[in-house]
């Protein structure tokens, strides 16, 4: 018995690397010394642009969205999701992404499927001037089923230590600006999949309500906010804190980026929750608290700023085609008039 008979096709793996090479190398900046094919990717750190350069790293996956996306052939889109989940995390520190690495594990290498995944990863990187420096594709028969794959991503960025955004400058009455999400993004899909299992006509019912394709809306790739944030920082707009709204929703993620003696007060009437979320809530009979603590509800990213920068930020977001609005403000925890986060729903 040889290795191929056991389920691992070394030759197919070599062919796959050859097929993805063009997509990967299209993302390479002048700082890439050596990328795909070697034992390690080599990247020249652009330290001349920084007084005290700090590297910022992040790693993430796409979660159980992969299960649904694979069943509906949304392979390119989950590649973008992978980049977004990592990149949106590191930019909250004010970092500029430098390079990205991916890990793909599968039961049996399907070159056509996984080429689309890598093309999606390359697209996400290329749109944000981030080099796809390398990765690993592991064929693991018996561990993963034949037609399934899992993804993990790793993003590294750079920021000047003096320009780190860490929430320490947040103060009372600072404004919270919301940037609209692209949909469900990559969180809450264990619940979504359960709702779908219990409603076998859910796609047709959604189309009656919205006149939109259910799976096209549900599986839209996660929005990447890097370019619009970079534009703000390049115009010397002071952002005191940022939050990527992922698992746990606004209630879990927004407080993470501010000092413990403050709380974010959110005006829940400042935006309309998108139809898709309300539809899922109804079909799944989701309790209000779980609804807010599971989904982003149309808010993908939040900024905390001094009010003097509000108009400039809203204008830049408009230029980048991103809806944005003032969603709330920062208050002290001991403020007797506002004692709870999202008081309308969490009492």
UniProtKB/Swiss-Prot annotation:
Keywords: ATP-binding, Cytoplasm, Ligase, Nucleotide-binding, Purine biosynthesis. Transmembrane segments: none annotated. GO terms for cellular component: cytosol. It is found in: Cytoplasm. InterPro entries: PurM-like_C_dom, PurM-like_C_sf, PurM-like_N, PurM-like_N_sf, PurM_cligase. The keyword Cytoplasm applies. GO terms for molecular function: ATP binding; phosphoribosylamine-glycine ligase activity; phosphoribosylformylglycinamidine cyclo-ligase activity. Coiled coil: none annotated. Its EC number is 6.3.3.1. It catalyses: 2-formamido-N(1)-(5-O-phospho-beta-D-ribosyl)acetamidine + ATP = 5-amino-1-(5-phospho-beta-D-ribosyl)imidazole + ADP + phosphate + H(+). It comes from the Bacteria. Pathway: Purine metabolism; IMP biosynthesis via de novo pathway; 5-amino-1-(5-phospho-D-ribosyl)imidazole from N(2)-formyl-N(1)-(5-phospho-D-ribosyl)glycinamide: step 2/2. One of its GO terms (biological process) is adenine biosynthetic process. Belongs to the AIR synthase family. This is Phosphoribosylformylglycinamidine cyclo-ligase. It comes from Prochlorococcus marinus (strain MIT 9301). The gene is purM.
């Amino acid at each position: 018995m040889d290795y191929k008979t056991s389920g691992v096709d070394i030759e197919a793996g070599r062919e796959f690397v050859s097929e993805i090479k063009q997509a990967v190398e299209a993302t390479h900046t002048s700082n890439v010394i050596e990328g795909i094919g070697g034992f390690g990717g080599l990247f020249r750190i652009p330290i001349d642009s920084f007084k005290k350069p700090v590297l910022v790293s992040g790693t993430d996956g796409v979660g159980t969205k992969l299960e649904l996306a694979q069943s509906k052939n949304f392979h390119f889109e989950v590649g973008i999701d992978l980049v977004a989940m990592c990149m949106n995390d590191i930019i909250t520190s004010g970092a500029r992404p430098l390079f990205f690495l991916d890990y793909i594990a599968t039961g049996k290498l399907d070159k056509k499927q996984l080429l689309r995944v890598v093309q999606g990863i390359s697209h996400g990187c290329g749109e944000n001037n981030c080099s796809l420096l390398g990765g690993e594709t592991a064929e693991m028969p018996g561990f993963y089923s034949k037609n399934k794959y899992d993804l993990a991503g790793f993003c590294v960025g750079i920021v000047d230590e003096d320009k780190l955004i860490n929430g320490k400058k947040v103060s009372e009455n600072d404004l919270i600006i919301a940037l609209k999400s692209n949909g469900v993004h990559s969180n809450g899909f264990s619940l979504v999949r359960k709702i779908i299992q219990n409603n076998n006509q859910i796609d047709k019912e959604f189309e009656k309500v919205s006149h939109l394709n259910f799976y096209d809306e549900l599986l839209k790739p996660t929005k990447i906010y890097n370019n619009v944030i970079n534009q703000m920082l390049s115009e010397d707009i002071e952002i005191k804190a940022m939050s990527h709204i992922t698992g746990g929703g606004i209630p879990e993620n927004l407080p993470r980026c501010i000092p413990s003696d403050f709380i974010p007060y959110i005006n829940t009437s400042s935006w309309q929750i998108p139809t898709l979320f309300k539809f899922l809530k109804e079909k799944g009979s989701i309790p209000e608290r779980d609804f807010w603590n599971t989904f982003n509800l149309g808010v993908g990213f939040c900024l905390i700023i001094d009010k003097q920068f509000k108009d400039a930020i809203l204008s830049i977001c408009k230029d980048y085609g991103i809806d944005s609005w003032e969603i709330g403000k920062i208050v002290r925890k001991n403020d007797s008039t506002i004692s709870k986060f999202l008081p309308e729903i969490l009492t």
